[in-house]
From Swiss-Prot:
Gene, per the UniProt record: mnmA
UniProt entry tagged with the keyword tRNA-binding: yes
Organism of origin: Mycoplasma genitalium (strain ATCC 33530 / DSM 19775 / NCTC 10195 / G37) (Mycoplasmoides genitalium)
Chain residues that bind ATP: G11, L12, S13, G14, G15, V16, D17, S18, M37, G139
Name assigned to this protein: tRNA-specific 2-thiouridylase MnmA
Top-level taxonomy: Bacteria, Bacillati, Mycoplasmatota, Mycoplasmoidales, Mycoplasmoidaceae
Biological role stated in the UniProt entry: Catalyzes the 2-thiolation of uridine at the wobble position (U34) of tRNA, leading to the formation of s(2)U34.
Gene3D superfamilies reported in the protein's UniProt record: Adenine nucleotide alpha hydrolases-like domains (2.30.30.280), HUPs (3.40.50.620), Translation factors (2.40.30.10)
SUPFAM superfamilies in alphabetical order: Adenine nucleotide alpha hydrolases-like
Catalytic site positions: C114 (nucleophile), C211 (cysteine persulfide intermediate)
EC number: 2.8.1.13
Assigned protein family: Belongs to the MnmA/TRMU family.
Length: 367
């Protein structure tokens, strides 16, 4: 990415990755401006159940602490920090659709929608309104390769921290004027840079909760928004009732914890859900979780090669090793994926992300 632009906006989250990104940008650009997104309000959003911790400021939600950390980072770098309230937009564009998906028996991924509609959508647009000629940066572990003036999303140097799975549903035009400062850095290097600058965030653990909401006991958290609806748990093969559950929307394919099946000798997994009858089906046979073919709908093309490759790499979840598969185009935005080796725990509502063999992201589709 050219550094002709004088101004770059960086999404400052209060974590180590965005902090080090801001530091690196400060060395390249005349003006760096931090932007912090406020996307969640516990009281306004009736967020009472499922908190993992309680502190003096915000119980369970890290938004308050994250903003304080972002301010410290901005002050230490001598850069301006803007706080942007996107609570209503996040609720309408990310959170409510997530709840509706759960009601349909799906397993949605709110982080993917957040990147498309909020971070690289509304926040990016907000920054362009302030300065139309500016660049936009985040602390994602991802890479942009410019080919024929087109930004192509690619796997970064630190493949263990690769976050392209969460970015693959962003529209390709949204990556114009976007840079990822950590593209060629390992996480250990990022933490060491933070330690050299005596930043508290140097050893801050990576966030694993819902995007901008924080750590939660997930099924309890969902009970803020979805009713308990008792139903039967049945054996997949015999169809015999073996227990009961609180509602099929609280469970996902492959889940083995929280099933209350302590009396059974073998470990069981969720293999199917019937949203109409509110029945949950489990099995102790992992073979029931394997699939060789999946369909991807609403496919978002980030890169359309002149000829579709005979083989692609596919992820059906973050941090999964990409699997070799064959690709069949059913329509412009519907694909059939056939894996070389069976994959486990495919959940409808998640995303399948495709890559070329040389690690360029083709895009993402809904499973």
């Amino acid at each position: 990415m050219s550094i002709i632009a004088k101004t770059v906006f960086i999404g400052l989250s209060g974590g180590v990755d965005s902090a080090v990104s801001a530091l690196l940008l400060k060395k390249q650009y005349q003006e760096v401006i931090g932007v912090f997104m406020e996307c969640w309000d516990e009281t306004l959003n009736n967020d009472f159940y499922g908190h993992k911790k309680i502190n003096n400021n915000k119980s369970g939600c890290s938004s308050f602490q994250d903003f304080q950390q972002a301010k410290k980072i901005a002050n230490s770098l001598g850069i301006k920090l803007i706080k942007k309230n996107l609570i209503e937009a996040y609720w309408n564009k990310v959170f409510l659709p997530m709840i509706q998906s759960f009601k349909k028996g799906l397993t949605p991924n709110p982080d993917i929608w957040c990147n498309r509609f909020i971070k690289f959508g509304l926040l990016h647009d907000f920054c362009k309104q302030i300065n139309p000629n500016s660049l936009f940066a985040t602390g994602h572990y991802a890479k942009i390769n410019m080919i024929e003036n087109q930004p192509l999303l690619s796997i970064p140097k630190d493949t263990n921290k690769d976050q392209t799975y969460f970015l693959a549903n962003v529209k390709k035009e949204q990556f114009q004027n976007v840079i990822f400062p950590l593209a060629d850095l390992k996480k250990i290097t990022v933490r060491n840079i933070a330690r050299e600058n005596n930043w508290e965030v140097a050893d801050k653990k990576d966030s694993t909760g819902i995007c901008f909401i924080g750590e939660r006991h997930f099924s309890d958290f969902l009970k803020n928004y979805l009713p308990v609806k008792k139903g039967l748990i049945k054996d997949w093969k015999t169809k015999q009732t073996i227990s009961e559950h609180d509602g099929v929307w609280f469970y996902t394919i492959g889940q083995r914890s929280g099933l209350n099946l302590g009396g059974l000798k073998q470990r069981h997994f969720v293999v199917a859900k019937d949203i109409e009858t509110n029945e949950l089906f489990v099995s102790c046979d992992k073979e029931e979780l394997l699939k060789t073919t999946i369909l991807l709908d609403q496919f978002n093309w980030l890169y359309t090669p002149k000829q579709l490759p005979s083989q692609v790499l596919v992820r059906i979840r973050h941090a999964q090793k990409p699997e070799i598969a064959k690709l069949k185009l059913l329509s412009d935005n519907k694909l059939e994926i056939t894996f070389k080796n069976p994959v486990i725990s495919v959940a409808s509502g998640q995303f399948g992300v495709l890559y070329t063999l040389d690690q360029i992201c083709l895009g993402a589709g809904l499973i």
